[in-house]
């Protein structure tokens, strides 16, 4: 990857309103995952991973259970995945993933985020080719070579592995997610994994400074206010 993986998640919600947005996004995603793959986490590995991720982000159990019960009961909303790509202020590449029950509304909402900040929304494929769709695992450690050897012994396809400041980051094709997860658990039963997700890793990070950085942050804030937006991926590196 040429550099250490940077987790670009927003800081944990500090206000009640922001927490509600986080809960809503997880609730919608868990509902769709359970509806499409079944409500039993032991039979639906994607759901099992999503529940684990939600708990790490401090989503209350009753929110998770409610979403699964809703999916198990049938009916309810029929959400569809929608993806929008383009270039954010300063020219950074961006991918916006949504879950929506009204595609026209969601497109208009996302489009306004681009328009209001001078960003440019494009057609499918506009910016996604500038990212690698990867499974990423991050945990404390000092011997990345031993981890790599252990994964290779389990016949795991590893794209890259990095060590920086006592943190090991493993990259693998997105299709290898559960294979990596299983192999790490088998080789290191007591390992605490801080990050385990499928994400879009930028191939070439872009430094955004000055006025462009301010506009870029406004762009992210506007997207965060859109109820249908689930994830935003970008290659921007902002000044501290």
From Swiss-Prot:
One of its GO terms (molecular function) is DNA binding. It is found in: Cytoplasm. Pfam families: TACO1_YebC_N (PF20772), Transcrip_reg (PF01709). The keyword DNA-binding applies. It comes from the Bacteria. InterPro entries: Integrase-like_N, TACO1_YebC-like_2nd/3rd_dom, TACO1_YebC_N, Transcrip_reg_TACO1-like, Transcrip_reg_TACO1-like_dom3, YebC-like. Its main location: cytoplasm. Keywords: Cytoplasm, DNA-binding, Transcription, Transcription regulation. GO terms for cellular component: cytosol. One of its GO terms (biological process) is regulation of DNA-templated transcription. PANTHER family: TRANSLATIONAL ACTIVATOR OF CYTOCHROME C OXIDASE 1. Belongs to the TACO1 family. HAMAP family: Transcrip_reg_TACO1 (MF_00693). This is Probable transcriptional regulatory protein VSAL_II0141. It comes from Aliivibrio salmonicida (strain LFI1238).
């Amino acid at each position: 990857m040429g550099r250490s993986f940077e987790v670009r998640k927003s800081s944990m919600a500090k206000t009640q309103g922001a927490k509600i947005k986080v809960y809503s996004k997880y609730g919608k995603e868990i509902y769709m995952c359970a509806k499409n793959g079944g409500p039993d986490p032991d039979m639906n590995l994607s759901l099992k991973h999503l529940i684990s991720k939600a708990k790490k982000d401090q989503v209350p159990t009753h929110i998770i259970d409610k979403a699964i019960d809703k999916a198990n009961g049938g009916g309810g909303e029929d959400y569809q995945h929608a993806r929008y790509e383009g270039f954010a202020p300063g020219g950074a590449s961006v991918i916006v993933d949504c879950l929506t029950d009204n595609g026209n509304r969601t497109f208009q909402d996302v489009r306004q985020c681009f328009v209001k900040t001078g960003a440019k929304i494009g057609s499918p494929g506009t910016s996604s080719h500038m990212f690698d769709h990867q499974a990423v695992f991050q945990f404390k450690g000092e011997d990345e070579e031993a981890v790599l050897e252990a994964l290779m012994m389990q016949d795991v396809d590893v794209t890259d592995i990095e060590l920086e400041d006592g943190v090991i980051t493993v990259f693998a094709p997105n299709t290898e997610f559960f294979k990596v997860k299983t192999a790490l658990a088998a080789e290191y039963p007591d390992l605490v994994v801080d990050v385990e997700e499928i994400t879009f890793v930028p191939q070439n990070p872009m430094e955004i400074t000055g006025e462009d950085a301010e506009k870029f942050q406004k762009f992210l804030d506007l997207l965060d206010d859109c109820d249908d937006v689930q994830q935003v991926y970008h290659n921007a590196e902002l000044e501290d």
